[in-house]
């Protein structure tokens, strides 16, 4: 027995001496890692509690999802169950920017109800009517800048940059009673670029989020990173918010509406800051990306642009006659907007939406407790079981004359159109965003003939998306219509 123990000690010493050699240690680490990943993959594919939910092989055996399958249900990770069925959409939530609870970061329940109740007064029908003049002002300023550019029809301009300025100024004005500065816009764009660069890490952290220990560590790292980069302070600092609050007497905007609900909703200052930051960033990103995408699709299909322009010229004798309320009854305008929002939903991606607390049956599939459930807007909007010609820009699918029996779109499932999410998670500012988008698109199309200058740009291929769209720029030449 003693000889055996001596032999074991000798072998352990030999192993330690071998591992002290960097080359041997590296080889052992690599071989051990490969073996671990292989065995983990076997477990995930054959023995994991949701192994019966089939999907792309790589997604089923590892948390690294490199394959997108446009199917009703697929398994994008060994602990994840991803749905594209209507009725299960929910927003991807990241804590990389926001330091306190806001309407997107809290689970549904009393906290979510409390925060939603605090924001709701900012988006009532009366609030929207009160804010129309502000949006008209910013759209008109953009039209005036474009008229100057149109004096040289050979000049190529970035329509995206002009639309970004429009939306940023408008959202800031709606939120605080004064336009947000271009410096804030630059800081926001830098933050968005940073988010795009580290998005794969955040996606992996979301996978870890399902583990009680690793998830806590991942959330801690995200919180530390937020403080290191100081993103929120560069876009809307707390001192800056305090100055806005002090200057709100007699004004009507998002901030005054939220302040009016502060006591009844029990909002802390940090929660007010987080929600105002969300309204500024989310309101800008969703509307700015949507406007660029709308003009991209219209200009890729010039006959659709001309058709919309003709409808507007027929409906209004002057661009000054266009009003927010009258645009609700312009079928081609709303069809073009709806179709672009289908192909390019304002926010995209899937993430750690919720974890099942007990086993449940979803759409005929048994999902065990502890499974992360998520949905993907892009996949939902391109699902061939819900849409005819799912990857094509067909605004006519939204027109009444193309929706009856015998039409190509008779089986379209319009309830699968969820660019602003649904249920308790539906975007609280969706109607305000649509109001601004309709006004901007109608006045610009009414006033200008446009040609897409960078026709080699293909949105689906060239634009990036890590929840927020980025790396897109619609360049145009234009002349007064």
From Swiss-Prot:
Membrane topology of this protein: Single-pass membrane protein
UniProt-listed Enzyme Commission number(s): 1.-.-.-
Domain of life: Eukaryota
Glycosylation sites noted in the Swiss-Prot or TrEMBL record: 338
Name of the top EC class for this enzyme: oxidoreductase
Pfam family, any one: p450
Gene3D superfamilies attached to this UniProt entry: Cytochrome P450
Cellular component, GO, one term: membrane
Pathway entry: Secondary metabolite biosynthesis; terpenoid biosynthesis
Gene Ontology terms, MF aspect: heme binding; iron ion binding; monooxygenase activity; oxidoreductase activity, acting on paired donors, with incorporation or reduction of molecular oxygen
Residues binding heme, per UniProt: 427
InterPro entries (alphabetical): Cyt_P450, Cyt_P450_CS, Cyt_P450_E_grp-IV, Cyt_P450_sf, Cytochrome_P450_monoxygenase
Transmembrane segments annotated in the record for this chain: 23-43
Entry's localization field: Membrane
GO biological process: terpenoid biosynthetic process
Cofactor: heme
Alphabetical keyword list: Glycoprotein, Heme, Iron, Membrane, Metal-binding, Monooxygenase, Oxidoreductase, Transmembrane, Transmembrane helix
Uses: Diterpenoid pyrones display various biological activities and FDDP E shows anti-HIV activity. FDDP D and FDDP E show also inhibitory activity of 42-mer-amyloid beta aggregation that is involved in the pathogenesis of Alzheimer's disease.
Similarity field: Belongs to the cytochrome P450 family.
Function: Cytochrome P450 monooxygenase; part of the gene cluster that mediates the biosynthesis of diterpenoid pyrones. The first step of the pathway is the synthesis of the alpha-pyrone moiety by the polyketide synthase dpfgA via condensation of one acetyl-CoA starter unit with 3 malonyl-CoA units and 2 methylations. The alpha-pyrone is then combined with geranylgeranyl pyrophosphate (GGPP) formed by the GGPP synthase dpfgD through the action of the prenyltransferase dpfgC to yield a linear alpha-pyrone diterpenoid.
The name this protein goes by in its record: Cytochrome P450 monooxygenase dpfgJ
Organism: Gibberella zeae (strain ATCC MYA-4620 / CBS 123657 / FGSC 9075 / NRRL 31084 / PH-1)
